[in-house]
């Protein structure tokens, strides 16, 4: 799931890397339309991947229980991140599983709030990878 997916570049890259069920969340109507156009043009070249864009406020989006990778490219501030993390936590408590958070810009590390069960796995330049485990 790519939060703040914009034009959909990350969705297409994820498909190229072998991800199958790929979702972008975007609030801007014009970016949603651009993203739909881009993934529509790409889809015939990779029919194995299911690419979807959803026009929704990230704070209101409830991730499906099959989601395992969450991607953030500096889309928003601490208050929104906090609420999105609550939604992700709810999803992994509903169906316990380990998930990964890819954070470009290392914003998540710079906020002064803790996410229970969230472990920094590594950082390369401005990319941070976290592992998030269910609490039970």
Predicted segments — roles?
Residues 3:
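Conserved beta-strand/loop positions that form the S-adenosyl-L-methionine
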């Amino acid at each position: 799931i790519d939060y703040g997916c914009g034009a959909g570049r990350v969705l297409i890259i994820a498909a190229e890397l072998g991800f199958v069920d790929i979702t972008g969340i975007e609030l801007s109507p014009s970016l949603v339309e651009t993203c739909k156009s881009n993934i529509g043009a790409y889809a015939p070249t990779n029919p194995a991947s299911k690419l979807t864009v959803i026009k929704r406020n990230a704070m209101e989006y409830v991730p499906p229980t099959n989601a395992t990778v969450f991607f953030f490219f500096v889309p928003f501030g601490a208050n929104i991140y906090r609420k999105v993390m609550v939604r992700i936590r709810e999803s992994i408590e509903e169906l316990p599983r380990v998930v990964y958070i890819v954070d470009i810009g290392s914003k998540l590390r710079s906020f002064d709030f803790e996410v229970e069960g969230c472990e920094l796995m590594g950082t390369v330049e401005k990319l941070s990878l976290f592992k998030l485990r269910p609490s039970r």
